[in-house]
Amino acid sequence: MHHTIKHLLETTLGFSVVLEKPKDKNHGHYATPAAFSLAKELKKNPALIAQELSKKLSEIEVFESVQSVGGYINFRLKQGFLDAQASLALSQGREFGKGDKQGSILLEYVSANPTGPLHIGHARGAVLGDALSRIGRHLGYALETEYYVNDAGNQIHLLGLSIYLAGRDSLLSLPVTYPEQYYRGEYIVDIAKEALKKWGEKAFADEAFIPELSLFGKELMLEEIRSNLADTHIHFDHYVSEKSLYPRWEETYALLQSHQGCYEGGGKVWLRSSAHGDEKDRVIVRESGEPTYLAGDIIYHADKFARPYDRYINIWGADHHGYIARVKAAIEFLGHDSSKLEVLLSQMVTLLKGGQPYKMSKRAGNFILMRDVLEDIGADALRFIFLSKKPDTHLEFDVDDLNKEDSSNPIFYINYAHARIHTMLGKSSLDSQEIEAASLEGLEDSIFDLLFLSLQLPQVLEDSFENRAIQKVAEYLRALAGEFHKFYNEHKILETPQEAALLKVCKVVALSLSQGLALLGITAKERM
């Protein structure tokens, strides 16, 4: 609907316009500041220009009224037009809000090391990435998702060593000497138990078996990670192994050299990242000749950019903020346009339970596990709360609040609105065809305001995706549910002369609620 109105304005005026929603809904459904952009060019008062434009725009058939206020031009849509838009939305069903955006996007997120279970920080980025992918695809983008598996380097050896030590110490009571760094937690002992079942005591007899334990532990962790993600309604198109890319290091290194992107110094190889906005140059090959963690990321981004997507989006933890400049510098030195890479940062999460800090997992030591919170509040509540705030802001919530059955629990509040509508539809003697064919003529303005709000979903989806502000969808759904509950409490709907018309409005509300929730990866409930 937004695009329809914008097209009508531009066709009538002959130039591009910005279409906004007035801050005060009493001013109308839409507004444009077009007069302000023309004022400088025409050297005239914006208010006078707005008055002149208003006369021209009054000729557009779908406008009930066109008013100029302080240079802004406000429009109110005709009820018949809104009725037609309601019928169109209902005929589209699950296609409602679907776009025809062009362009390909590779979205990489989570990419947690396969050395331990997913914690609640991983979960926030996971949910954000999945919601972005769902909305992006619905808008028409050719979007693919990817998980980068960090299965090379010292952390994988450390995983195998930790399993080896746990097996000797906790299972076989053999003497061990723990190093300063190793992975702790019950999950390590659990993997050691599985290794004991598979290989017997020989798995812990000699350190030569550590590489086998590393591979075994990595595969078990990846299996658990995939399971946690699936239980949160998250699936990836691709899993890319860091280890599988390492044979390409020499050619990647040669490419960096060919673009004067690296140099040797102090027995190390340095990325000349300060030339592209980083605060200093970074080591990519140690004195030992071993590539650094950054080198692995450079190979991965070389692989990414060799696949010709129009845009690349990474979702990283906020602690990786300083990493952006060095990766973008590497992309430039590989001969690619680093502006095609966009990095979104996901901030920390603080969990409470009954007002007290949420207990850390015994299984994983100093972490709150994604699995524990899933079992506490369920995937739908977890997803909604993580999507309710900007990802780059700190999030704190009490899980007990998400188990409440009242308006303080946003996911309950939204689902209750959706379920109320389905309950009414089930009780009504009218069939779907009768309801959808009903005329809305004669309904009061406040009901058309509710209908107008329910028809905003397509634009909310587009704005939220393009601005990477998925919280706007959550805010919209909560606002729509609130307006519906108000309408429900103020109107008798069933067994009235206007039953069909009122239920038609309700069906559009339900469509937007269910569609919006689905694109957040949440199931809308029809019964509660």
Curated annotation (Swiss-Prot):
Coiled-coil region(s) at which residues? none
- Which CDD domains does the record cross-reference, listed alphabetically? ArgRS_core (cd00671)
For this protein, what reaction is catalysed?
tRNA(Arg) + L-arginine + ATP = L-arginyl-tRNA(Arg) + AMP + diphosphate
Chief localisation class: cytoplasm
The protein's matches in Gene3D superfamilies, at most eight in alphabetical order, are given as: Arginyl tRNA synthetase N-terminal domain, HUPs, Isoleucyl-tRNA Synthetase, Domain 1
Q: Which GO terms describe its biological process?
A: arginyl-tRNA aminoacylation
Give the location of motif 'HIGH' region in residue numbers.
112-122
- Keywords on record: Aminoacyl-tRNA synthetase, ATP-binding, Cytoplasm, Ligase, Nucleotide-binding, Protein biosynthesis
Per the record, the domain of life is: Bacteria
> What's any one GO cellular component for it?
cytoplasm
The EC designation for this entry is 6.1.1.19
Subcellular location per the Swiss-Prot or TrEMBL entry: Cytoplasm
What is a GO molecular function of this protein? ATP binding
Q: Return the InterPro entries for the record.
A: aa-tRNA-synth_I_CS (IPR001412), Arg-tRNA-ligase (IPR001278), Arg-tRNA-synth_N (IPR005148), Arg-tRNA-synth_N_sf (IPR036695), ArgRS_core (IPR035684), DALR_anticod-bd (IPR008909), Rossmann-like_a/b/a_fold (IPR014729), tRNAsynth_Ia_anticodon-bd (IPR009080)
**Subunit relationships:** Monomer.
Q: Which family does it belong to?
A: Belongs to the class-I aminoacyl-tRNA synthetase family.
Its name, as the record gives it, is Arginine--tRNA ligase
Please name the taxonomic classification of the source.
Bacteria, Pseudomonadati, Campylobacterota, Epsilonproteobacteria, Campylobacterales
Q: Give the encoding gene's name.
A: argS
